[in-house]
Amino acid sequence: MSFSVEVLAGIAIELQRGIGHQDRFQRLITTLRQVLACDASALLRYESGQFIPLAIDGLAQDVLGRRFTLEGHPRLEAIARAGDVVRFPADSDLPDPYDGLIPGQESLKVHACVGLPLFAGQNLIGALTFDAMTPAQFEVFSDEELRLIAALAAGALSNALLIEQLESQNMLPRSSAAFEPIKETHMIGLSPAMTQLKKEIEIVASSDLNVLIGGETGTGKELVAKAIHQGSPRAVNPLVYLNCAALPESVAESELFGHVKGAFTGAISNRSGKFEMADNGTLFLDEIGELSLALQAKLLRVLQYGDIQRVGDDRSLRVDVRVLAATNRDLREEVLAGRFRADLFHRLSVFPLFVPPLRERGNDVVLLAGYFCEQCRLRLGLSRVVLSPGARRHLLNYGWPGNVRELEHAIHRAVVLARATRAGDEVILEAQHFALSEDVLPAPPAESFLALPNCRNLRESTENFQRELIRQALAQNHHNWAASARALETDVANLHRLAKRLGLKD
């Protein structure tokens, strides 16, 4: 069999019809799957020793969230190193990365596979993979015909990468259709909400503006900060992280600005603070809403004038730091309540970003589940970890109050449970392995004071009552100490100290 001119022209026309990179890629692999009459096709981007799916047809949706490392997938490694068409026979000993990931064929293994490495000059930029359940499916196609397909795909991918590079250098205007970043940021998701967020990140990253990142706990605000830093001119310099919610008031100023020897008891030497460490780079202040008003005033001064003072030192030090701040609070309400400075809020929120909760991201749940399944597979040394159709439906129907972090933990727990009930190194996750309705239990009803155990004295009764209140607050807030402190209307540092005194934490 040979490709007719009409077939090749049809592939080229489909590429031209696409609106934006993603649409072109999808049209390409859908058309190629039809031409080769196979069960599945995929276009992969190569970056940093791994293949990243850009478009798929005939494969489970969670494949788009997986990241295929060369060391973890011998077939993909063979494709990357071959430099030409690679055909895997039906009896190949190398496991196929898509085993169990073709819908309706979860229990069967792929019988025929062809891989086409894609090059821009001498550089590997991606690959095309085609899979079939029929062993001899690809024998009718010559290597020369498959090379033609590879050339078309390589041209499309290379052009997309070039456009992205020129846009990032502000050498091309960013049209709404073409402006679809395809580089890897580990921010997995194709939902409208995530697509919009990625566009906003690309816009603000190249500037030097301070950014306020809002969103619920567990949505991935730190990943947003990393993406902004990586896309900025400061990427060659450090990104320094500080969790404001974990800062005891007594050391918070020293952590931010540093101290000199003898500034306070225990200051046995000079120490740089996070601002000095981030000089010429970026400082990410997580949970900034937990900072005291006194520290907010000192932070404001740094943003205004660009200088800091170490604790115990009269001298000022100049720093050049971009500040990215994150919070799960509504800082506008905090300003109205007098708990957050209005001038600091306006300094930070020049370009605010909001990370959507997982429940508003639709099918991104499945993509993220695929990513975490692949992580578990590598970590536990398994040959495959796949989601059954029932498990996918189960994940989509759940509300995810703990967002992406809860999904990650749920996948890890499900893999451990499934592995314990099935021999071998292959794991298929079923709905019953998640039991999500039990993962987030409502907090038990508060015991009345009279229902507490009899205690000898007032102090013991008070401590028991405090323990119960803290336990309930932690249960209701998914063991987030900052959120629990807000619910109890106390300072988070005081809550940590009280919990230690009551034996609730080490």
From Swiss-Prot:
InterPro entries: AAA+_ATPase, GAF, GAF-like_dom_sf, Homeodomain-like_sf, NorR, P-loop_NTPase, Sigma_54_int, Sigma_54_int_dom_ATP-bd_1. GO terms for molecular function: ATP binding; ATP hydrolysis activity; DNA binding; DNA-binding transcription factor activity. One of its GO terms (biological process) is phosphorelay signal transduction system. ATP binds at residues 215-222, 278-287. Pathway: Nitrogen metabolism; nitric oxide reduction. The keyword NAD does not apply. Required for the expression of anaerobic nitric oxide (NO) reductase, acts as a transcriptional activator for at least the norVW operon. Activation also requires sigma-54. This is Anaerobic nitric oxide reductase transcription regulator NorR. It comes from Salmonella arizonae (strain ATCC BAA-731 / CDC346-86 / RSK2980).
